[in-house]
Amino acid sequence: MKNRVFSLAMLSGSMDDAIIIPFLDGLVEAGYQGVCPHPRNGLKVPYPSRLYWQRLARFIELAQARGLEIWHYDEFPYPSGQLGGVLVEDHPHLASQTLALETITAAPDANGFIDIGRGTLVALARCRLDDKSTFKAIHDVTADTGMHLDSWICNEAHNLGYTATTHIHREDHERAFPKRISRYYAPETPLQDNEILIAIKATPGNANYQGLHKPDLTRPEVTQFFADHIYTQLSQIGAAHHLANTPIFQDEVTFYSSFPWNEEIHQTLRSQWGQEFAGNLLALFNTNIHGWENARFQYRTLCADLLEKNWYITIKEHCHRHQLQMTGHLPGEETFGGHAQIIGNAFKNLRHFDIPGYDIISSTLPDDIDRCHATGIKLVQSAAWIDGRKPTMAEAFGANGFHQDLQRNRTVLAWLGVHDIKQICDHATFSDSRSLTKYDAPPIHNRFNPMHKGAPDLWKWFQWFCDLMDQYQFDPQTLVLFPFDALTLFTLQEKQWKAQTSLLESFFHYLCAYSLDCVFLPSHQLPEVKATADGFIFQGHHFSHFIIPPFSSLHKSTFEALQQWQQLPGFCWVLPEDTTGITLFGEDHPKSTFIPITAAQIKNCSEDELVKTGANWFADMLDSPLHQWQSPRSVIKSLRINPQNQEKLLVIINPHDDPIEITAPYFGAPLPQPPEHCAMEIITEKDISKVLLAPRATAIFRHQKSTSIKINSPTYRTITPEKCQWRIAGDNFWNVKKGNLHLESHTQIPFATKAVSALWTLTPNATHPQFDYHPLPRQLKLEATFPLHLNTIIPSLSLILDLDSMPRGARWFWDEYELPHTIRDIFETQNNVYDIPTSLLTAGAHQLHMSATIENGAQGILERPILQGDFVIAGEYPLHLDRRSHQWQDAKSTFPHWREVGFPEAFGPAEYSCDFIIPDLTTGNILLELPSCIGIAKITLNGQNVGRNNWEPRLIPLPKVLLHDGRNTVQITLHGSWNNIFSRLNYRENGLHQMPVLRVHTP
């Protein structure tokens, strides 16, 4: 069955027929093909009692009678659910634990002993630091710790009235020695001023939703408990209802701790590390410790292996014995601050899932997809391709708001790129969440929509999604090495590592956002890649480029495998952040070795090749900041560099056709480079250095101080005319409904951030573009010409068209010049971007010409052709709200105007206007309360300017001298660089998001 839409049914309430039957009927009516029962908070049937299994069997029976397919999504037995918490309540020794560091500051007592406090001690390290707080020596002194007898609780019979050494009363003894158990360190020699004690202790892991502790999934007895209590019952219900191979969907399996710990991990690492045990544990937290890469690699690998052995393999074998199939989300790992991330080689656990493939989870992503989710999505996508599995999308609509998730998941699809994601639609896909709670029941989950009968908009969206995916064909061109052994990735919650990882992390995020045709290659499969004269072969597929990210450390075997390809065309090793080299680690490297890598060795691609392959990551970081990145909508203001008193390299590539200005308090001299690669001018004003970097040029700087660097890139504004619809009709030609474009000069307005040189207006009665097509047996050649006229020279201009609606392989020309294009993410959709060289933007007549080949009889719509450049928009206002008259009711009352705030489908200034009547000019002062808005708002009263509002909310007084007796008109004109861009997608960020209000203020 194809294109199945499931409802994730929240089993709350009593699960009576009176609730279940209307719910299932509503799903059938709305067009769902399946239902996924999911016990959740608010369930009023004891779980997992016999009554619960009876009610669940009844639910399945009713669903089958209506032709609905059944999956079972049981979060309760998993770590995020309640049953895991109950397990720990009954068996405390099965709770998850995590490592934690504690610096011991207690002074020695009279005997020279140091109190290291309570808690489960794993190791005690005595560390010597240099003047830069770098660890120079670490000694494991755990053997020198023990209980101090004087601190024991004295309630035994022989301690009631005296001790072995003194004859004092019990009360005096307890005052002298409090009732507590503590450990003490007995040093052989006193601590020096440059020495510290660090205790490594095991503490409880994170709690679940209800505050219950979570189980340790590296213990086999935990897995067996879940299997016995849940899977056996599910298999019996499935057999009774002839549901062979009922799928069991696993929720995000995780350690639920940053540094999981138990006896098996302790014993294994103690035997491996010996005398280096305490030092290697400290190295998990701190990169200033010698050998941290190797220690972290061994630790993560051990944890991943235990999770695979004791959870995934055990659960899979149990499911198969009971004719169940296992699938689920990518393992969630809190160590890396994300819902779907990588821990060492735990990514291989995906291969234990049976159906339907690898889940590219979208669920309830935030409005601005964070880099963890985006990278996780891309990695699962690559894993599905590498392993020959089908990508699927579970929880396509999460539980936190159906209509919002409709917008967010379109964003997710954009991140997935061109990876043949139509396969997602060929397999079962969870959809929006429904609660079975009655209307009059207590609000168990306010975010759920109780008794919501179906979702026609979901179904329409899903069908649109299926149709859209028909256009995608995945043909990967670029391999990107993803290092399962470079364990400095995605450590967003660990502040000590963040400075070390931000560069590599941003690089991966950039590739996820912009390199839609790349596949992430696990480092352990590197030997399978074969180099050829024109590219690289992996699993029988050809790749034109192979990108190696800017690693600061690599496993020795990985490094040696890469060295052989350094001179091959298409091979690009991006410059590491540290100029001195790369740290190698491995089994035959007990000590880390620094291997010097020069720029000449690792940067073998020409600048054009870097642009084509997406390796010019820093260039696009001009528009997507390294440390401040939140979404593709962000524009960089400054970039903070912290070299930590070490000389660093800063690589800046200018991808634009105009120079960019770089300003910093200090710049070292640029590295010598051939003139064709570095064209710049350095201007020194007092302590400020300015560098003008020529178009399409690259500069590499040395800098030795922490500095704020300001990079002024061209400010782009994106606009579009009214929606254009080009449709391939049955007569095999393009029918242009609207879309003739015209550019005219315009006077600069006071609040423009740059010189206004042009504006975009529609010419409704202009001649339609001419077309020439040549019928072919199976294909048609499509050509279209658009005349334009520039009354003045403009600084920059780009043509942007949606990939969703572009004819495949379309070529665009500006006059006779073919426009080279890139793929750029403009807000929430991918686009072909055609940059027009500034030398061609002369005043006068021009034409845009498109040439493409299409399938005979195909249908499609080309929406929203966009011009992007340094100009603002004027012309006819795309939005006029109905003007309404209001009478004053109370001099101090607040009354609404602007009955609703709509958002225009076209681009340009949004106008909001309202009429009001003043019966008496002696009324108090009238203030216009304007909410915060994106852009700049210009306010007029009866045609006269009264002020403007920039970003922040404020109260604007309406001058009495401009007020009329009777009718008055207030008009707000909203301009802005982001104003009304893709308004249907970003409706919360366009125009005014709240109603303006007129207030009367009586002194």
Question: Model-derived features: where do they sit?
Answer:
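C-terminal accessory/binding modules appended to enzymatic or scaffolding proteins
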Residues: 643, 910, 931-933
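Repeat-blade elements of multi-bladed beta-propeller folds
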Residues: 925-927
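Acidic/aromatic-lined carbohydrate-recognition and catalytic surfaces
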Residues: 38-183, 199-224
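Extended acidic/polar, glycine-enriched regions
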Residues: 149-239, 686-714, 843-845, 854, ...
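Carbohydrate-binding surfaces of carbohydrate-active enzymes
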Residues: 3-6, 10, 14-22, 32-36, ...
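Short aromatic-centered micro-motifs
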Residues: 127, 536, 629, 682-684, ...
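Beta-strand-rich ligand-recognition modules
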Residues: 804-867, 932-992
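Catalytic beta-strand/loop cores that center a nucleophilic Ser/Cys/Thr
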Residues: 122-155, 159-161, 610-645, 915
